[in-house]
Amino acid sequence: MSVTCFEQALQIMRIRGSKMDFESRRQRILDKMEDNSIAILYSGIEHHVSADEYDLFTAQANRNFFYLTGLRRDNMVLVLDKCVEPAKTMLFIEEADPTMERWYGRKVTMEEAEEISGIDEIEYIYELESTLDRIMTREDVYTAYFDTYRHQKVDLPDYNVVKANEFKTDYPGVAVKNLFPL
């Protein structure tokens, strides 16, 4: 029985960090976050090369996202919610589509994501906006953390910076802070 490249990658991820490591890293971030705050961390997206082609091979997940989840895939979102007691950790992933997987590669399942990250509250990515709207309308959120770090001013903003700016527009009364120093 042969092992696929995807299964090999999963085995490597399991070796590099255990669920306990990722859980303790997330807990350290939650401990440093202000009360009544959330952290939203995007893994990143694929980039267009041309009108009908994506750059699938050089796309990399945000390193801080990987550090907190152990998942190195695009189009995922980690949400840490410190507006409720106890604090909640949620992960949003893409739903598998057999046709798309044939062309672009296999997606991580909910079970695999839970096994690697230790996060048990996992939803599909299309639930993210409604979940954020629910959090923002039902909880007292004063601060939202995003990974807005840029090494130099001339660096192009990554997807987290773009999403942080969208969040500022959608929720102008909520302070947006950089997650990086935590």
Predicted regions and their residues:
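A composition/biophysics-driven feature that prefers long, compositionally simple stretches
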Residues: 1-182
